[in-house]
Amino acid sequence: MKKAILSVSNKSGIVEFAKALTNLDYELYSTGGTKRVLEDANINIKSVSELTQFPEIMDGRVKTLHPAVHGGILADRDKEHHLEQLREQHIDLIDMVVVNLYPFQQTVAQPDVTETDAVENIDIGGPTMLRAAAKNFKHVTTIVHPSDYNEVIERIKNHQLDEAYRKSLMVKVFQHTNEYDHAIVNYFKDNKETLRYGENPQQSAYFVRTSDSKHTIAGAKQLHGKQLSFNNIKDADAALSLVKKFNEPTAVAVKHMNPCGVGIGQSIDEAFQHAYEADNQSIFGGIIALNRTVDVKLAEALHSIFLEVVIAPQFTEEALKILTQKKNIRLLQIDMTIDNAEQEFVSVSGGYLVQDKDNKDVTRNDMTVATDTQPTEAQWEAMLLGWKVVSAVKSNAVILSNNKQTVGIGAGQMNRVGSAKIAIERAIEINDNVALVSDGFFPMGDTVEYAAEHGIKAIIQPGGSIKDQDSIDMANKYGITMVMTGMRHFKH
């Protein structure tokens, strides 16, 4: 029987994963909080102490640091003398290690964190097990991200848990532990930058960098301009997160944490022009994120309007000469690699909330056309573009998009039809190829009816309301095509 060690701080999906492993005849071992969660779910789980014949000591600081664990993980199964030594020491082979680490980054990001809190959230046993298992990827499966659970189970079922896949998991492990170590170094080397003020002048503020990864705002290289403000940092992070969702040349304009214009194109110049045309008023004083190099042509366009921050993976020398003529504009060079961080957190009074990032992608094949009328190809393209954008707009969010840009954005209203009204009132165009995109389902048919009255012919929304049929009937009445994604994008 194969053996797996499960020890996770992020419990998302661990119960379902453990059940699946049990059904596949894995013997499970765990520690502390993970073990309690699995026991509460009536999963047959053993303590790691049964492997080590040694208790957890020092408030859990020493649990898995034992030859019975690391020998079972590190043994090279192609070497008979390794296996003989295991038999002599009565050590069992470990086939899978599932570990994610103490939440150090989340802990040190809290404004009231103490050094003691930080120290207690430095994981020792977890990285050691991960690195050991990753080193022995030829024989051991190592999982650090909950998003890999489902694929691992499917591969086990289909006998496809091969060395090449285990090697890909190994790379994720060393990338993860590298970022974790960087966060610890950055915290203890006093990586706190005092800002001029916070959201408003009466609020003091500082910026704590828990990572210097070059694909994050914290690790950005500032090429020009004065110090980033508190609001600049938040807006820049929002713009960066959205532009990374796109593969094609894309420009994202953000104002007060909401996109005000998003454009795609055959070139980055064309993409920026589409974003600018989407709302040439709101872009004034905003943040622009671009996922391609800024050249002279684009620099001239950017120079012609007032912008607080421009983000791009590269700027040509000629582009920099143009843009640096404005002394206050901030130019940030950032790697557009997708951030591997799987969680985000928000401070609340007395604590903080932690959740998985809303980065699950839905493809056209995952969606359902709920109406009699099928979308045209242009409508599909408009809906897919809009569906990416709406995830970055404050709820209730309703936006309009065509296949190259947003054309109207309604954000942050307390009722959905109110957001729809704003999006439609501000629309730069409405025609058959413009889609209305909603981040949540329609509780009744009024939004669809309002859209129909203003010429909308395509709608995409999550579905899931007990009154979905009302919206479907309303769409059919007006000959509107409506697609349901099965997934919502609330953003608070």
From Swiss-Prot:
GO CC field: cytosol
Catalytic activity: (6R)-10-formyltetrahydrofolate + 5-amino-1-(5-phospho-beta-D-ribosyl)imidazole-4-carboxamide = 5-formamido-1-(5-phospho-D-ribosyl)imidazole-4-carboxamide + (6S)-5,6,7,8-tetrahydrofolate; IMP + H2O = 5-formamido-1-(5-phospho-D-ribosyl)imidazole-4-carboxamide
Domain MGS-like: 1-144
GO molecular function, one term: IMP cyclohydrolase activity
Pathway(s) where this gene product acts: Purine metabolism; IMP biosynthesis via de novo pathway; 5-formamido-1-(5-phospho-D-ribosyl)imidazole-4-carboxamide from 5-amino-1-(5-phospho-D-ribosyl)imidazole-4-carboxamide (10-formyl THF route): step 1/1; Purine metabolism; IMP biosynthesis via de novo pathway; IMP from 5-formamido-1-(5-phospho-D-ribosyl)imidazole-4-carboxamide: step 1/1
Transmembrane portions of the chain: none
Entry annotated with the keyword Kinase: no
Sequence similarity: Belongs to the PurH family.
Protein's UniProt name: Bifunctional purine biosynthesis protein PurH
Species of the source: Staphylococcus epidermidis (strain ATCC 35984 / DSM 28319 / BCRC 17069 / CCUG 31568 / BM 3577 / RP62A)
Lineage: Bacteria, Bacillati, Bacillota, Bacilli, Bacillales
The gene coding this protein: purH
